[in-house]
């Protein structure tokens, strides 16, 4: 069947759910689709569909591992929504998922209040540059005491402020995602309030349309008879059919031509900043491109191994290391969708870095990746985030 052309009528915004495991992120995503589908603004999807790629834990729960993309509309906008994994082990995916957000919906269970991963996700949202967080206080139907809800709300505001979000004025919507799925009026009303909140609170992103095209590769697959498709979110610029592009990072830079562009299984003649697209690349083998490389306008970005960076090392209370590290420390660095091992070299006269410190260091990666000044990254070790940083200068 011929694919429908994608209609651009409303402004397009990327959002996503973040928060602690079992606080209701995926249930909220399902409830938004359920409520909006009743108005003809979304296609309904079940919890199990959204949590696809999850590993089943018991009869009712799925640990959401895969980042799941869904789409829906409000009265004003078209949203692409990523359901981000909440489990601590999968923060790595959270880093690639949160990178796709113009704003985040932080889901907090009223019964539990903020938990360790709530904190970690807010920090990561700050590091990957999510500009605005709207809060959905979920499961309020389980709490009879309004004072308790006020306390939880206060705690959330303090936490947002701690990580440089506007906690004082943050929009906090109280509701029950399950009640919304079941079609209960108070459940649906909360989802409507949330839709209004994301419409007004999450700024329409200043798309970086005029900059040279760049997309970080998230996934690669081959389509029989057509060639290799690379998927990801266009970070900046515009790509059109038959544009020449470069594949940069992890191996020698190569050049190719874009022979197809699609979004949500519909064909486009161009993709622009903020779109999640698949690009069909001429003459590229499935093995010729991998996650973590970038596809970019020719000569617009180059691969580098060495840089200076300002880093913040999480304190023990924030879930970071308990002990200092020394010159020559070798963690993983997460850039866009790439994880690369590298070495941290401390400034002269500095013997060690303590948890809670922030400091300027030199980093050297084992593979060259597409890198530029002001780019953010996370520092990971043994499956958890221990710090975050920003490139201040490219060395070589």
UniProtKB/Swiss-Prot annotation:
Protein keywords: Cytoplasm, Elongation factor, GTP-binding, Hydrolase, Magnesium, Metal-binding, Nucleotide-binding, Protein biosynthesis
Region of interest (G2), residue spans: 60-64
Record-listed E.C. numbers: 3.6.5.3
Region called G5, residue ranges: 176-178
Residues involved in Mg(2+) binding: 26
Pfam family membership, one: GTP_EFTU_D2
Region ranges (G1): 19-26
Listed GO MF terms: GTP binding; GTPase activity; translation elongation factor activity
Reactions catalysed, as given in the entry: GTP + H2O = GDP + phosphate + H(+)
Domain tr-type G residue range list: 10-206
HAMAP family: EF_Tu_B
Subunit structure: Monomer.
Family: Belongs to the TRAFAC class translation factor GTPase superfamily. Classic translation factor GTPase family. EF-Tu/EF-1A subfamily.
Protein name (record): Elongation factor Tu
Organism of this sequence: Opitutus terrae (strain DSM 11246 / JCM 15787 / PB90-1)
